[in-house]
């Protein structure tokens, strides 16, 4: 009996001591690349700022963000469809006030320049399901898609699903720490669409950055807390802007506004990166 008790104690002690070959989960963001996922001109920017700048055109940009984490690649938003690159006059909207989009560089070509194959990317997340953000989701048919359930369930044109039913998906209901180490957090920011989301990324040298998605479209709207006319819920939009403002303060973070050309002109684009 004494031998049995002694053996049990020995096994308990050995089990309580971390083993030398036990590998902790890898953590931390290593790099963030800003990819050119579209450029265009809005016919009338009052579409995004009701009652302000009526009749004025404005240059827009569209960004995707490739995040290299210790556990693998994450792509945030997929931009205008790569097929638009072959359209000499760009993709013209039905509404002349909206954006005529061009695709100077395909997403596939920019990934190739970095030596990244679409199959290397195991996770993608989209801010929302407007076409300028989900245009290339099916370049990554096996990647886990992170999207809010409210967005996934939101009917598309003619009640069509917004994603292929066979695409692997994680339907979120609120914020999500993607890698479990606090370095990449999806923030639920509904309003522009029912399940809109933004992304908080913590970089070792650059510090914290919030990727807005379309919670805000350009700096003037952010400064004046304006909700666009193309919007699901104004009160939710304003509440989400406040959530982002609180996050910026708490994390001492920068706000990178997806469609703001003036801001993007001052940022490094791929193949340069932030770390």
How would you name each of these model-derived features?
Residues 6-16:
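Bacterial N-terminal signal peptides
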Residues 82, 95-109, 200, 205-275:
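Cap/insert and terminal regions of metallo-dependent hydrolase folds
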Residues 1-4:
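Positively charged n-region of N-terminal signal peptides that target proteins for export
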Residues 37-38, 78-81, 129, 150-151, ...:
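Active-site metal-binding loops of divalent metal-dependent hydrolases
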Residues 54-58, 187-192:
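Short Gly/Pro-enriched turn/cap motifs at secondary-structure boundaries
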Residues 18-132, 144-188, 206-213, 233-254:
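Metallo-beta-lactamase
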């Amino acid at each position: 009996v004494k031998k049995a008790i002694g053996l049990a104690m020995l096994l308990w002690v050995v089990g309580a001591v971390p083993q030398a070959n036990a590998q902790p989960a890898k953590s931390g963001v290593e790099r963030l690349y800003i990819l050119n996922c579209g450029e265009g001109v809005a016919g009338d920017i009052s579409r995004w700022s009701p009652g302000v700048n009526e009749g004025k055109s404005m240059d827009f940009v569209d960004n995707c963000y490739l995040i290299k984490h210790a556990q693998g690649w994450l792509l945030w938003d997929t931009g205008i469809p790569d097929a638009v690159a072959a359209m000499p006059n760009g993709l013209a909207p039905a509404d002349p006030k909206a954006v005529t989009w061009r695709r100077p560089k395909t997403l596939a070509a920019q990934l190739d320049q970095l030596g990244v194959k679409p199959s290397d990317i195991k996770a993608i997340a989209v801010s929302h399901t407007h076409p300028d953000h989900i245009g290339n989701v099916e370049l990554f048919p096996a990647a886990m898609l992170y999207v809010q359930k409210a967005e996934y369930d939101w009917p598309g044109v003619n009640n069509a699903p917004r994603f292929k039913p066979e695409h692997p998906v994680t339907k979120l209901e609120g914020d999500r720490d993607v890698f479990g180490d606090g370095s990449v957090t999806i923030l639920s920011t509904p309003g522009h669409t029912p399940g809109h989301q933004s992304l908080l990324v913590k970089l070792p040298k650059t510090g914290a950055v919030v990727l807005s998605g379309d919670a805000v479209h350009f700096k003037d709207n952010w400064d004046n807390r304006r909700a666009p006319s193309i919007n699901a819920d104004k009160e939710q939009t304003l509440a989400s802007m406040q959530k982002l403002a609180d996050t910026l303060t708490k994390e001492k973070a920068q706000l990178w506004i997806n469609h703001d050309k003036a801001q993007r002109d001052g940022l490094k684009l791929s193949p340069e990166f932030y770390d």
